[in-house]
């Protein structure tokens, strides 16, 4: 049963309409996570989520919103939505965000099925695989070829986390990029786990 985050945690969501922020808000609401309208009250936002459609890029308004939180050291997460028919993917969005937002941390990478659709996530922390069945993550050990495929990315991620320090996300110093597919639930649990770290 989903539990609610504390009433004192204020979470805001930003993103171009092409990134379907309304659908993401609903998916989070289904998990007991409330998204609040912020207006100009940025100082009291505890976390900002930035929804990105890889095919549409990141618009100037979203970049400005990201930058507006720099002075507050507000925790920020980029959610990259897998949308039907999208030509670009998670890796493309992260590359762009590294240029226009900040250095992004990628705790998970997407594993694709034979038809090219997102099928699972692999953790760069412990190299486990999260397969999603009806929106529920089933965690298993990765195969040796998966470990080899992501070895360099995992090392880079661990170095970034180590250099950022403990609780760097909550301190607004480490910016996770999370792949999400609303159709099959990929990544929603990962996003929720980050949001629940906030106090």
Q: What are the functions of these language-model segments?
A:
Residues 29-43:
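A short, well-structured beta->alpha microelement
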């Amino acid at each position: 049963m989903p539990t609610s985050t504390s009433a004192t945690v204020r979470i805001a969501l930003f993103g171009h309409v092409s990134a379907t922020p309304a659908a993401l808000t609903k998916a989070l609401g289904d998990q007991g996570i409330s998204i609040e309208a912020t207006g100009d009250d940025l100082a009291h936002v505890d976390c900002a989520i930035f929804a990105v459609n890889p095919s549409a890029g990141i618009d100037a308004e979203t970049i400005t919103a990201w930058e507006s939180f720099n002075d507050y050291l507000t925790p920020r997460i980029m959610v990259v939505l897998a949308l039907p028919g999208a030509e670009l993917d998670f890796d493309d969005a992260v590359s762009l965000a590294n240029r226009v937002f900040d250095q992004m941390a990628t705790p998970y990478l997407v594993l694709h099925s034979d038809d090219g659709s997102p099928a699972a996530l692999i953790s760069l922390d412990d190299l486990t695989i999260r397969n999603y069945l009806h929106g529920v993550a089933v965690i298993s050990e990765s195969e040796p070829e998966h470990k080899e495929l992501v070895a360099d990315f995992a090392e880079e991620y661990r170095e970034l986390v180590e250099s950022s320090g403990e609780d760097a996300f909550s301190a607004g110093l480490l910016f996770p990029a999370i792949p999400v597919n609303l159709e099959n639930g990929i990544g929603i649990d990962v996003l929720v786990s980050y949001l629940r770290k906030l106090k």
